[in-house]
């Protein structure tokens, strides 16, 4: 079993080290992670400059780019053999609902999925690495179940969110759908030392759709949430509607 591990918090993040230690229990591990924190970079690839890859004292390789860069470079030139599984995390903070659109953690896993490799993104819901040991045990349980069941031979993408509590690995896992958040808080306007206005992106909105069956509901009740994701952004439910509209008004631009 060959496992590629990435993240978006950077190669020095405690969550990465914890996940790598777990993955080594299941196979040969390669680590390719960002040089710096790259949270919120989504699926961005660096196309305007070359990327550099260096090796840290602990053997982790790090890239001066995004999480997607890391997995892309690993799969298309850096690794001698294709991995059997790509895992990302453990992230410092939740990636639930709309977070998945912006998440570098999810994007790193998705990059593996786009190359045909099954992939899992792991996130610890509260920031600050509280109960990282429990989250690590939960991640171990997910990996053990996936690998023992032979599901790693299939093609899928899973988003796993782990509640920040000491018993995170003890309650039953829940398969969930993505919930939704309210709009983000307004930007925070400040003034630079030069007197120019500068802006910080506001905090993520609170949960808006968090009913039973959602990732928000699962973690709020102490359960590890596992959400199967897909990449197809087509609005299949409205294909017929838009096709009919275009026919009714002529098909030319």
Curated annotation (Swiss-Prot):
<keyword id="KW-0547">Nucleotide-binding</keyword>
<protein>
    <recommendedName>
        <fullName>5'-nucleotidase SurE</fullName>
        <ecNumber>3.1.3.5</ecNumber>
    </recommendedName>
</protein>
<dbReference type="GO" id="GO:0046872">
    <property type="term" value="F:metal ion binding"/>
</dbReference>
<dbReference type="GO" id="GO:0004309">
    <property type="term" value="F:exopolyphosphatase activity"/>
</dbReference>
<dbReference type="GO" id="GO:0008254">
    <property type="term" value="F:3'-nucleotidase activity"/>
</dbReference>
<keyword id="KW-0963">Cytoplasm</keyword>
<feature type="binding site">
    <location>
        <position position="9"/>
    </location>
    <ligand>
        <name>a divalent metal cation</name>
    </ligand>
</feature>
<dbReference type="GO" id="GO:0005737">
    <property type="term" value="C:cytoplasm"/>
</dbReference>
<dbReference type="InterPro" id="IPR030048">
    <property type="entry name" value="SurE"/>
</dbReference>
<dbReference type="Pfam" id="PF01975">
    <property type="entry name" value="SurE"/>
</dbReference>
<keyword id="KW-0479">Metal-binding</keyword>
<comment type="function">
    <text>Nucleotidase that shows phosphatase activity on nucleoside 5'-monophosphates.</text>
</comment>
<dbReference type="GO" id="GO:0008253">
    <property type="term" value="F:5'-nucleotidase activity"/>
</dbReference>
<dbReference type="InterPro" id="IPR036523">
    <property type="entry name" value="SurE-like_sf"/>
</dbReference>
<feature type="binding site">
    <location>
        <position position="8"/>
    </location>
    <ligand>
        <name>a divalent metal cation</name>
    </ligand>
</feature>
<comment type="similarity">
    <text>Belongs to the SurE nucleotidase family.</text>
</comment>
<dbReference type="GO" id="GO:0000166">
    <property type="term" value="F:nucleotide binding"/>
</dbReference>
<keyword id="KW-0378">Hydrolase</keyword>
<feature type="binding site">
    <location>
        <position position="91"/>
    </location>
    <ligand>
        <name>a divalent metal cation</name>
    </ligand>
</feature>
<dbReference type="InterPro" id="IPR002828">
    <property type="entry name" value="SurE-like_Pase/nucleotidase"/>
</dbReference>
<feature type="binding site">
    <location>
        <position position="39"/>
    </location>
    <ligand>
        <name>a divalent metal cation</name>
    </ligand>
</feature>
